[in-house]
């Protein structure tokens, strides 16, 4: 029997032959029948009559020629798919034995051998190919100490411009120059470097900026921050966010930070708490809410030492820390977030263990000794007792690598380092999740492309005498200063890995004719393609988002959400799979097949996080099967089917292009946060209403009549 299935976006409509039996799941043992050949249908893409379209290689290429239209809500991607049943008893990860899809008027067979275009050696040596066909390659970043810098064709290198800032670390500069980048200053305006060239940079490593300023970032440019990460970078905001989660889910889950009071707001509460513990000589540590590198920090035990008007955070002091050789120490962890929608978190395998330069004691008389109670390198390097560590593999001096520390704990102290590492990963995920709601809202409101942002965090953790990790603070611009061979050993590979995971493309303005004078190879897929990173959704994709974010049962969305992948789904998945190829030294700790419990803690259900939960559940044990599935879809160009403009009345759509936006003014960050949160609230209400409408149109999401592979 042959069942004809029309797939529109995510929806599945079944039209069996007149004499067919009732439809059964694909694994029910129906005999396989070859379908009759069909005429090639015309593509069903609705556009305005005034649009000037061009058809290239059977695909409609109107991405840059379309303008917003009132009819954009009816834009949809239609295909017809013949599903052939399979009676084989062999285990398989794919749901369908064969899919033949009519895509934009061209019949394609995803299971045929995929032919990849071969790039010239000069280009292949400086780029990293994607795992997937019809996805542009990524620029390759080599380490800072690479003795043979990359050789890049002049037609590409002239566009590899990196905008310098006052805080761009030296190790980042060395990595960039070895990788073929030209470093430009924002004030550069000479004959050799005219002012307009400073606007064409493709990367920048700078300070965090106000959320509205992210709207000025162009397509094809990357910034090393997301909007709103001050929500975890400021000690007061971090505590408030964790406090909300702790109140909702319990201290056992979110009691990861020592009890903190934000002054002057919490002055009365702190006074009451202080009086309860005054007889115990309780120690407290005072910190400015937004400082770094130990500035303004002191340990106190008397109420008179507490500032009464100045904004500070007062935190209960962990008075029984884990000691090594009699000294207190903390851990600097490096955490990379490459995406917020979906949330993807990486933890660097190495880091720093920073020791206090004076041996620890808990006498009240010692509280003024900063070299005993504070572990910041910026403070302890000034101590006469400070000893640098010149050997990154040695357990000596006042700074060790994280790898060396864990080896020491395992061999010398018989510590279960695997369990300790798992508890640290749990702390990191909860820390990022605590600010996810605001970061998500501000990113949606101010960032126009998924390509624009990534962020490296420095998370400081203290171990108590029971080896419980305590969160101290989060740095949104962690120091990459490398003053010793040990620092270089840790931070050098870190920088190149971060830049490779950020996945930069060759700029779209690259002159392809100059790269292929002989025209003996295809380079049309070489530069950056904005369709891969669009945040715009078709109506069908939006409806699928609404339905699957309103499903409460996890097993339901695990069973159904992958049945029919949309083009937007495929774009998200191929980006994540390409990242996993180059996470050298980085471990993706979220999402994994075992992190679904953290989805409960998010500000609300997120479609992409559920998509990845299902993907990891199904394919984490057999990544090759998942990659092969995506490769077959990409071979058809399916992932490049992207709406050129947002849907009408789409509250989640990004802001207009930079040329039509108001200039970023000094709007207080709190105001932009409130605006974004209000938009998020409106979006939630609209989502509920639209989901109900979608359910009325599409029917309830019962188990699907056919177990479909993603439509090709």
Specify the residue positions occupied by each region the protein language model found.
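Short glycine-enriched loop/turn motifs at secondary-structure junctions
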Residues: 156, 223, 254-256, 289-294
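Hydrophobic residue at the +6 position relative to the catalytic HRD Asp in the kinase catalytic loop
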Residues: 459-461
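Acidic, PEST-like segments
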Residues: 2-216, 229, 233-248, 255-257, ...
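Glycine-rich phosphate-binding loop of ATP-grasp-fold ATP-dependent ligases
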Residues: 259-261, 280-307, 322, 331-332
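Short, acidic, Ser/Thr-enriched surface-loop or helix-capping motifs
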Residues: 464
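Short amphipathic alpha-helix with an adjacent loop that forms part of the alpha/beta core around
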Residues: 270-277
């Amino acid at each position: 029997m042959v069942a004809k299935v029309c797939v529109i976006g995510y929806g599945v409509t079944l039209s069996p032959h007149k004499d067919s039996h009732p439809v059964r799941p694909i694994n029910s043992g129906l005999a396989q029948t070859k379908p009759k050949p069909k005429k090639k249908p015309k593509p069903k893409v609705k556009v305005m009559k005034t649009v000037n379209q061009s058809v290239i290689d059977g695909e409609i290429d109107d991405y840059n020629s379309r303008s917003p239209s009132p009819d954009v809500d009816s834009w949809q991607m239609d295909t017809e798919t013949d599903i052939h049943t399979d009676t084989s008893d062999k285990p398989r990860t794919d749901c369908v034995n064969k899919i033949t899809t009519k895509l934009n008027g061209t019949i394609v067979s995803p299971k045929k051998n995929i032919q990849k275009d071969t790039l010239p050696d000069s280009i292949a040596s400086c780029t990293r190919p994607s795992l997937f066909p019809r996805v542009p390659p990524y620029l390759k970043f080599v380490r800072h100490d690479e003795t043979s810098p990359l050789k890049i064709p002049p037609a590409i290198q002239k566009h590899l411009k990196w905008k310098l800032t006052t805080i761009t670390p030296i190790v980042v500069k060395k990595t960039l120059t070895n990788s073929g980048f030209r470093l430009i200053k924002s004030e550069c305006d000479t004959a050799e470097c005219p002012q307009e060239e400073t606007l064409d940079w493709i990367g920048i490593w700078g300070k965090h900026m106000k959320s509205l300023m992210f709207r000025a970032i162009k397509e094809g440019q990357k910034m090393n921050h997301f909007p709103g990460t001050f929500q975890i970078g400021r000690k007061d905001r971090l505590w408030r966010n964790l406090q909300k989660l702790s109140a909702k889910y319990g201290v056992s889950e979110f009691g990861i930070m020592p009890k903190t009071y934000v002054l002057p707001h919490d002055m009365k509460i702190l006074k009451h708490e202080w009086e309860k513990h005054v007889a115990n000589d309780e120690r407290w540590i005072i910190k400015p809410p937004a400082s770094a590198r130990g500035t303004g920090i002191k340990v106190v035990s008397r109420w008179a030492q507490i500032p009464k008007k100045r904004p500070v955070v007062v935190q209960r002091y962990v008075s029984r820390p884990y000691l090594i050789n009699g000294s207190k120490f903390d851990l600097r962890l490096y955490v990379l977030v490459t995406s917020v929608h979906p949330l993807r978190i990486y933890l660097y395998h190495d880091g720093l263990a920073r020791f206090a330069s004076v041996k620890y004691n808990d006498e009240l008389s010692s509280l003024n000794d900063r070299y005993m109670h504070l572990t910041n390198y910026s403070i302890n390097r000034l101590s006469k007792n400070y000893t640098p560590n010149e050997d990154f593999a040695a357990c000596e001096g006042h700074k060790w690598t994280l790898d060396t520390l864990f080896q020491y704990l395992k061999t010398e102290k018989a510590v279960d380092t695997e369990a300790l590492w798992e508890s640290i990963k749990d702390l990191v995920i909860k820390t990022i999740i605590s600010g996810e709601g605001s970061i998500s809202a501000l990113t949606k409101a101010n960032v126009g492309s998924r390509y624009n942002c990534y962020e490296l965090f420095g998370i400081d953790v203290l171990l108590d005498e029971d080896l419980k990790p305590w969160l101290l603070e989060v740095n949104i611009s962690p120091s990459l200063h490398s003053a010793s061979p040990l620092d270089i050993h840790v931070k050098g590979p870190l920088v190149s890995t971060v830049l490779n995971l950020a996945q930069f493309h060759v700029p779209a303005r690259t002159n392809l004719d100059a790269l292929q004078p002989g025209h003996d190879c295809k380079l049309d897929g070489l530069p950056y393609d904005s369709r891969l990173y669009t945040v715009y959704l078709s109506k069908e994709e939006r409806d699928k988002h609404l339905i699957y974010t309103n499903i409460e049962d996890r097993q339901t969305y695990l069973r159904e959400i992958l049945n029919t992948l949309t083009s937007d789904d495929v774009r998200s998945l191929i980006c994540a799979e390409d990242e996993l190829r180059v996470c050298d030294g980085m471990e993706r700790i979220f999402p994994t097949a075992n992190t679904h419990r953290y989805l409960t803690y998010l500000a609300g259900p997120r479609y992409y996080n559920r998509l990845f939960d299902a993907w990891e559940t199904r394919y984490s044990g057999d990544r090759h099967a998942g990659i092969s599935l995506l490769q077959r879809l990409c071979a058809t160009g399916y992932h490049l089917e992207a709406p050129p403009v947002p849907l009408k009345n789409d509250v989640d759509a990004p802001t207009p292009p930079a040329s039509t936006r108001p200039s970023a003014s000094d709007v207080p960050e709190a105001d932009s946060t409130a605006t974004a949160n209000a938009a998020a609230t409106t979006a939630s209400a609209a989502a509920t209403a639209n989901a109900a409408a979608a359910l009325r149109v599409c029917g309830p999401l019962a188990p699907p009549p056919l177990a479909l592979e993603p439509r090709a």
